[in-house]
């Protein structure tokens, strides 16, 4: 018992040892299944598997670190160090980092002062110093301290963004509203969390509170969906703002050009931008990296030029007292200018969302030693120019450029604006993919643009949707001042979401002192709420459009999550009883035809109700049935060796298995159906061999234990689903399995159950080889994909809002989303579908 207890404790804590004791493929003992399901009707089948696995675990020996497993088996996985990169590779990654991560924040000098002084006109030098001081400290506090020094460390195995934070919390506390998370998911190597301290006592109360409170779970999900909707809205505003501010420089170089012409040129650039998006980051990364490097050097150089020409008195702005003077002199106008001031930190959230496969340390060093100094010099130079030209308040950046360098800088600025827009679009794609993987966004076609590096994706529907939205926004507003206010709304929405989620990570995972956490929350949330009050005051100027846009996106995601949750819970309640399968016998009340049937469903436990419809509809069923559930777990990558989790649904003579194919939200699913079938069959063979090996070890160890385990292996899971299921059709065949012997695939004869205690070692090996041969023959006969298309409808007595949401909105989304099987490219000749409607 002591040994068993120690195994349980090791399984319950976060693994830090390189050697483990666990099975990934195993046959579970279901002796306690009925009792467990009575106590926990919504738990997955692996709740029993976890306990039995712990009783049977053996030490597997030294095992390579889980993150190294990801890197070895899946190209592009995040590594925790840069030691394996050559100097040349580091230089390449540094340039790509500039192009991917810093494009948005790097173009903020194009419009920050212009938008600020549109709200608060310049009346004297102190106004310039006050505005500059606001910009400097906003950049230092939000971009540097909050994001670069703190938020970047909250990445999920290298993945950043709102949903990465949510995924990190879900892995440490069961707060997901979709009840399909299994204890076995915690045994995925990349599921393990790294925390500063091995002691979890301080975070235990928070974890229990989050897991026990349905209200907190809903609030957390709504907060994440709200932040995600703002990220997508940001994907619309950023290209419009960046491109228009860059093209607007033409009004300085060509005084006669009109605003309508600027708008049309901006639209043309936007069309080009979104047209090349499909080529991926890696294909243009080497080009945009050097371009951004030249841009930052130009920005710093222009700043130094202006400081030398107009004086260095602007360095006084590092004294925060000028912020006080600024508000004292301008009061309301200074407060309204806060919305424009925030634009200097736009792109801070994109730095986190675009973290991707770059290391945190490299991003931090690049920002501190290149990006931040160039930005500070750029703003100081513009302020120095304004000190001598108080009447200039529009297009400040382009007016501050030396006349001889205007057109080269204009060209570089336009390129930088396009790169910044592209980076935000890429972040939007990544965010949508993460939300789709966690069941919060309708499935869409996702194209992976790189074979070597993961995370580089392209979503055609979203790409063209963003293009149309950007064009409409540019044509409707036609001014960077109005777009700038909308930009501030979306950026602050994402920032505040991160500010609220990060303290949960700090307390739950990092286990930081609560005083430090509360100080972080109060300071940054208070700061961002102050900025938010400023941008909301000007919402009547047209910025309300972006709020409506974000609200529509939020409703789409919430309705999809709500409908998916109802559908899953209904399928769990109406699943087939195992007693019924026992009564039907080994032939399932019909004829077993040669071949393998892969029945896709969303259940992680139990027999799906749609299987009964196949039995009643089809004259025969395949000799081998595998219930396949493609399940996304909240980790970036699931190693290929841990992709499939198998168990038997019935005794061996039934030839029915359950397979859960687990994918992370960064996993690349580009395999064709032949590759998927091959991987699945190989994994099934490994499962059967390990099962036989386990039985053999038990037989050699203790005859009494052997008999008990063998007896329990024939017992099956009986789940109290609360529904009565009947085929209501005459049985096509009714065979008594106990009176049959082994026969060929496709015949109506079956297997007589044989206990392990009655078999010699050679008989056991013969039984194993026979079953493997059975699988090979079934595979040669063909694999058919059995798809149950389940729809949900609200009951007639449901309240009106529920009928509207389920019968119309959710039905519309489900009808137009991409089917999950489409990723496998299954030919129609291998496909069989049955529809079923659930009343909820």
What is each residue range found by the language model?
Residues 2-840:
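The structured alpha-helical core of multi-pass membrane proteins
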């Amino acid at each position: 018992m002591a040994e068993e207890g120690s195994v349980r404790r090791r399984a319950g804590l976060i693994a830090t040892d390189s050697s483990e004791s666990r099975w990934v493929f195993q046959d579970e003992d279901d002796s306690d299944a009925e009792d467990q399901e009575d106590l926990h009707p919504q738990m997955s089948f692996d709740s029993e598997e976890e306990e039995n696995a712990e009783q049977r675990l053996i030490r597997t020996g030294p095992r390579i670190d889980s993150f190294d497993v990801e890197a070895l088996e899946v190209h592009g996985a995040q590594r925790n160090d840069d030691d394996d990169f050559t100097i040349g590779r580091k230089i390449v990654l540094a340039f790509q980092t500039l192009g991917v991560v810093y494009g948005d924040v790097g173009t903020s000098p194009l419009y920050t002062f212009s938008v600020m002084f549109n709200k608060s006109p310049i009346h004297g030098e102190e106004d310039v110093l006050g505005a500059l001081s606001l910009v400097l400290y906003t950049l230092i506090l939000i971009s540097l301290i909050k994001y670069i020094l703190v938020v970047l460390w909250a990445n999920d195995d290298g993945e950043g963004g709102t949903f990465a934070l949510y995924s990190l919390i879900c892995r440490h506390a069961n707060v997901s509203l979709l009840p399909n998370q299994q204890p076995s998911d915690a045994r995925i190597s990349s599921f393990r969390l790294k925390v500063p301290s091995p002691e979890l006592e301080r975070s235990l109360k928070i974890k229990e509170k989050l897991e026990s409170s349905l209200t907190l779970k809903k609030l957390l999900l709504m907060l994440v969906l709200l932040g995600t909707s703002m990220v997508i809205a940001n994907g619309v505003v950023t290209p419009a703002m960046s491109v228009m501010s860059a093209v607007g420089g033409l009004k300085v170089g060509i005084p006669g050009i009109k605003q309508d012409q600027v708008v049309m040129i901006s639209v043309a650039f936007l069309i080009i931008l979104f047209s090349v998006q499909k080529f991926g980051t890696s294909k243009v990364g080497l080009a945009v990296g050097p371009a951004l490097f030249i841009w930052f050097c130009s920005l710093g150089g222009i700043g130094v030029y202006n400081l030398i020409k107009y004086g260095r008195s602007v360095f006084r702005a590092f004294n925060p007292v000028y912020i006080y003077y600024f508000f004292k002199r301008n009061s309301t106008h200074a407060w309204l200018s806060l919305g424009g001031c925030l634009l200097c930190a736009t792109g801070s959230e994109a730095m986190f969302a675009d973290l991707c496969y770059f290391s945190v340390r490299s991003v931090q060093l690049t920002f501190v030693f290149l990006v931040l100094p160039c930005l500070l010099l750029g703003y100081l130079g513009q302020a120095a120019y304004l000190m001598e030209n108080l009447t200039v308040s529009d297009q400040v950046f382009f007016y501050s450029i030396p006349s001889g360098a205007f057109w080269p800088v204009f060209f570089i600025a336009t390129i930088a604006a396009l790169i910044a827009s592209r980076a935000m679009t890429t972040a939007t794609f990544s965010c949508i993919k993460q939300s789709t993987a966690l069941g919060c966004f309708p499935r869409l076609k996702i194209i992976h643009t790189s074979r070597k590096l993961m995370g580089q994706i392209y979503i055609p529907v979203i790409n063209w949707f963003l293009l149309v939205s950007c064009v409409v926004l540019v044509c409707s507003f036609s001014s960077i001042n109005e777009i700038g206010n909308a930009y501030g709304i979306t950026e602050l929405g994402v920032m505040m979401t991160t500010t609220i989620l990060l303290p949960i990570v700090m307390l739950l995972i990092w286990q930081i002192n609560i005083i430090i956490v509360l100080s972080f929350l109060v300071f940054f949330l208070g700061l961002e709420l102050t900025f938010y009050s400023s941008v909301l005051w000007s919402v009547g100027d047209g910025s309300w459009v972006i709020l409506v846009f974000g609200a529509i996106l939020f409703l789409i995601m919430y309705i999809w999550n709500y409908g998916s949750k109802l559908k899953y819970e209904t399928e769990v309640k109406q699943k087939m009883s195992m007693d019924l399968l026992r009564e039907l016998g080994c032939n399932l009340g019909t004829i077993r035809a040669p071949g393998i049937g892969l029945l896709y469903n969303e259940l992680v436990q139990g027999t799906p109700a749609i299987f009964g419809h196949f039995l009643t509809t089809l004259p025969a069923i395949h000799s081998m049935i595998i219930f396949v559930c493609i399940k996304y777990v909240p980790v970036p990558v699931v190693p290929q060796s841990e992709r499939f989790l198998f168990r038997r649904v019935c005794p061996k003579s039934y030839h029915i298995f359950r397979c859960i194919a687990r994918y992370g939200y960064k996993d690349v699913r580009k395999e064709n159906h032949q590759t998927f079938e091959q991987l699945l069959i190989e994994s099934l063979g490994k499962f059967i061999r390990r099962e036989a090996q386990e039985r053999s070890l038990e037989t050699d160890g203790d005859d009494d234990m052997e008999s008990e385990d063998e007896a329990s292996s024939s017992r099956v899971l009986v789940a109290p689903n609360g529904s009565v299921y009947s085929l209501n059709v005459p049985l096509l065949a009714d065979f008594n399995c106990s009176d049959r012997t082994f026969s060929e695939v496709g015949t109506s004869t079956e297997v007589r159950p044989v206990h392990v205690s009655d078999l010699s070692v050679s008989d056991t090996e013969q039984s194993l080889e026979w079953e493997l041969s059975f699988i090979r023959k079934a595979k040669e006969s063909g694999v058919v994909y059995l798809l149950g298309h389940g729809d949900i409808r609200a009951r007639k007595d449901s309240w009106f809002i529920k009928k509207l949401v389920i019968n119309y909105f959710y039905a519309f989304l489900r009808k137009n989303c991409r089917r999950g099987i489409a990723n496998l490219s299954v030919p129609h000749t291998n496909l069989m579908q049955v529809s079923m409607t659930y009343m909820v």
